[in-house]
Amino acid sequence: MSQKSVVLHLYRSLVRESKKFSSYNFREYSLRRVSVGFRENKNKDQNETKELIQDALKNLEMVKRQAFINSMYSTNKLVVE
């Protein structure tokens, strides 16, 4: 896979997992961090991109765990939802 397709796959995976948060605040924060983080790093060189991909993979696993934990302890919906 080319680096561009790996990055795109990571972005989509992070967005998909971020949408699984049951809490509105966590969900919106996570989606915002994903989009801002990818936008900030879109013009990095290949060596930096490889390191950022490794960081994003770790973050993806963290988001998966946190979304699961958040769904286990869900609360009532907020008014904004």
Swiss-Prot record:
Q: List the disulfide bonds.
A: none
Record localization: Mitochondrion; Nucleus
- Assigned GO CC terms: L-cysteine desulfurase complex; mitochondrion; nucleus
User: What does the UniProt keyword field contain?
Assistant: Mitochondrion, Nucleus
Q: Does the keyword Transmembrane helix apply?
A: no
List the InterPro entries hit by this protein, alphabetically.
Complex1_LYR_dom, Complex1_LYR_LYRM4, ISC_assembly_LYR
User: Which pathway does it take part in?
Assistant: Cofactor biosynthesis; iron-sulfur cluster biosynthesis
Q: Name one GO biological process term.
A: iron-sulfur cluster assembly
Task performed by this protein: Required for nuclear and mitochondrial iron-sulfur protein biosynthesis.
Give the family per the record: Belongs to the complex I LYR family.
| Name under which the protein is recorded | LYR motif-containing protein 4
Q: Which organism is it from?
A: Dictyostelium discoideum
